[in-house]
Structures are given as C-alpha cells and as structure tokens.
Amino acid sequence: MADFSRLPGPNADLWDWQLLAACRGVDSSLFFHPEGERGAARSARENSAKEVCMRCPVRAECAAHALAVREPYGVWGGLTEDEREELMGRARNRLVAATASASAGGEAAGPH
C-alpha cells in the first residue's frame, strides 16, 4: 500500500499536470497489474501502458511524481514499478558513494 504521508498537501496547482495526461479516460487496469499477473501477459500490458506514456505531454511530471512519493504500483510516466525501484536504488547507491567519498576527502584534508 502507498504511504500517503509522503504525498504533497492539498494544492490543486501541484496536480494540474494530470489534466493534460494522455491516460485520462483510459481504463486504469492498463496501468496496474491484476493480482498474480506474470510473464508475457504482464510484459504485454506494461508495454501497452508505456505506449500511452510515450505520447504523453506530461510524462516527465508523472514519472517525477511517482518517484517522489515512491509509488509502489503501476506504470507511471513510462516507468514500471520495477524500473522505478531500480532507479531509486541507483540513486541511493550514488548518494552513499558520494557521501563516503566526501567523508574520506574531508578526513584526508585534515583540520581547517
């Protein structure tokens, strides 16, 4: 289940991008997998959802939203849940590496 505490407050301006989404009016089952869907069926559905996303004028905003709130389900902005998790994992790894590098560099420089 999504953690709604991470969602932005009730500010309609933050959500206006959704009014321009190519998926408006499209059956949401295209973007969210049914329980137990696997393999070729899941891949085909996700590819169909991504086709809608590829022609969407607010694809970047949609993907950014899904990443920001850590949306655990569905295709958002052309990214599946697995793809979003992979992106977040890579970002975490880069942050950890940068933090470790900065710490090591700071220690090597000595006192200021």
UniProtKB/Swiss-Prot annotation:
Q: What does changing A21T do?
A: In whiD16; white on sporulation media, forms defective spores killed at 50 degrees Celsius
Q: How is it modified after translation?
A: Can be nitrosylated by NO, 8 NO react per cluster. These complexes are quite stable under anaerobic conditions, but degrade slowly aerobically. Upon Fe-S cluster removal intramolecular disulfide bonds are formed.
Note the InterPro entries from the entry. 4FE4S_WBL, Whib
Q: Where is the 4Fe-4S Wbl-type domain?
A: 22-86
* Domain of life from the UniProt record: Bacteria
**Which GO terms fall under molecular function for this chain's record?**
4 iron, 4 sulfur cluster binding; dinitrosyl-iron complex binding; DNA binding; metal ion binding; protein-disulfide reductase [NAD(P)H] activity
Q: Which cofactors, by name?
A: [4Fe-4S] cluster
Q: Which UniProt keywords apply?
A: 4Fe-4S, Cytoplasm, Disulfide bond, DNA-binding, Iron, Iron-sulfur, Metal-binding, Sporulation, Transcription, Transcription regulation
GO BP: any one term: sporulation resulting in formation of a cellular spore
Q: How is the cofactor bound?
A: Anaerobically binds 1 [4Fe-4S] cluster per subunit; cluster is lost on exposure to O(2). Cluster is stabilized in the presence of mycothiol. Following nitrosylation of the [4Fe-4S] cluster binds 1 [4Fe-8(NO)] cluster per subunit.
The residues that the entry says bind [4Fe-4S] cluster are C23, C53, C56, C62
Q: Which PROSITE patterns match?
A: 4FE4S_WBL
The protein's induction, as recorded, is: Expressed in exponential phase. Expressed from 2 promoters at the onset of sporulation, no longer expressed in mature colonies.
User: One of this protein's Pfam families, by short name?
Assistant: Whib
Task: Explain the activity's dependence on pH.
Answer: Optimum pH is 7.0 to 8.0 for 4Fe-4S stability.
Q: Say yes or no: keyword Transcription regulation present.
A: yes
| Consequence of substituting C62A | Spores remain white
Quaternary structure and interacting proteins, as annotated: The 4Fe-4S form is a monomer; upon oxidation forms a disulfide-bonded homodimer.
List the protein's name.
Transcriptional regulator WhiD
Recorded source organism is Streptomyces coelicolor (strain ATCC BAA-471 / A3(2) / M145)
Coding gene?
whiD
